[in-house]
Every structure is written in structure tokens, then in C-alpha cells.
């Protein structure tokens, strides 16, 4: 993912998943090793926090982001010949021991703003919600408060918003299923 990750390409498939899994980018340069949380790595469209003498030496996933966590990624592309995501969504979920409550939800997006991003308001609202279809639909609808997709020749803002809600719903449903929850 070097070219898409380091050019701050919002449509990069890996970028939304790295957001949802709280990745840390490890950079090594003349001054040693530096670790940057993925949420701070993307500065603006086309710009990331890497110094001219640095190279990426690792992408780290914190234990709390994978232990007892399950995730899924869906991408919507307009056609197979142009595999660039119109919108991409990745969800990482941790359920309670009885599988009836969402303890932690992380939602990452590509092409929902100028840089890959998290739906932090939706995530905060998801914590403690019951594992129900109504809760999934509520969380999915709430991502509209976090994202800011643009109009482009590939898709309108309205279409991207619609897709983001639907992809969140599908990713959350699949992640809950993978975690052992029943909707």
C-alpha cells in the first residue's frame, strides 16, 4: 500500500481498514524511529506526515484493536474496469462476553472526505448499544454526521452518503456475525 498510503489517496483500500484498526505508522530516518497514529498521519489531501529522509518500516496494530475484535471491509466501485473505490468502509467491533452488547466499534472510511477518516461520533454513539438490527441501522445512519464526501465525476456527494450508510450497515452486520453475535 506504499503508493496509496503515502500519497494520502483517500480511495486506498487499506487506508480505511488501517483507520478502523487504530494502526500506527512506524517511520525511520536520520533521527531514529518515529511512530505516528494513522489518524494523525494524514494531514490533508495529498499530504502525509513523513519527513524527506524517512521511510516506512512498519505498520503496527495495537493489541486492543485486534484482541477479541472482528472486522470487515466493503468497497463500492462503479465498475470492475475502474476498481477505484467510490466509497470504502471498514468496521472493527468488539462484543461483550455474552455477545449481546457492542463494547467498542471503530468505523473507517475512504472517499468520505479529503483524507481517509474515522466516524468518531458514530463510534462514540455505538459503544454500549445492544446487538440488534435497530442499533445497527441507527449507527449506520449516524455516520453522516462524521463524513464529508465530495461531488466528482465518479459519484455525487448524495450517492456517496447513501453508499456510506449502506456499507457501514453491511460491515457492522458482518463484523458482528464474525464476532459471534446474532442479529
Predicted regions and their residues:
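C-terminal structural segment of proteins
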Residues: 1-183
Amino acid at each position: 500500500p506504499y503508493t496509496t498510503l503515502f500519497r494520502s489517496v483517500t480511495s486506498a483500500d487499506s487506508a480505511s481498514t488501517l483507520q478502523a484498526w487504530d494502526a500506527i505508522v512506524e517511520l525511520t530516518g536520520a533521527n531514529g524511529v518515529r511512530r505516528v497514529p494513522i489518524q494523525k498521519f494524514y494531514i490533508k489531501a495529498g499530504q502525509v506526515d513523513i519527513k524527506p529522509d524517512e521511510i516506512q518500516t512498519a505498520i503496527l496494530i495495537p493489541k486492543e484493536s485486534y484482541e477479541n475484535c472482528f472486522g470487515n471491509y466493503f468497497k463500492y466501485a462503479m465498475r470492475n474496469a475502474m476498481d477505484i473505490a467510490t466509497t470504502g468502509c471498514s468496521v472493527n467491533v468488539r462484543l461483550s462476553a455474552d455477545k449481546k452488547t457492542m463494547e467498542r466499534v471503530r468505523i473507517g472510511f475512504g472517499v468520505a472526505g479529503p483524507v481517509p477518516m474515522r466516524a468518531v461520533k458514530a463510534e462514540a454513539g455505538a459503544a454500549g448499544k445492544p446487538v440488534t438490527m435497530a442499533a445497527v441501522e441507527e449507527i449506520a445512519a449516524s455516520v453522516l454526521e462524521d463524513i464529508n464526501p465530495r461531488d466528482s465525476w465518479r459519484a455525487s456527494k448524495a450517492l456517496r452518503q447513501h453508499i456510506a450508510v449502506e456499507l457501514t450497515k453491511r460491515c457492522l452486520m458482518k463484523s458482528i456475525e464474525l464476532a459471534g453475535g446474532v442479529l
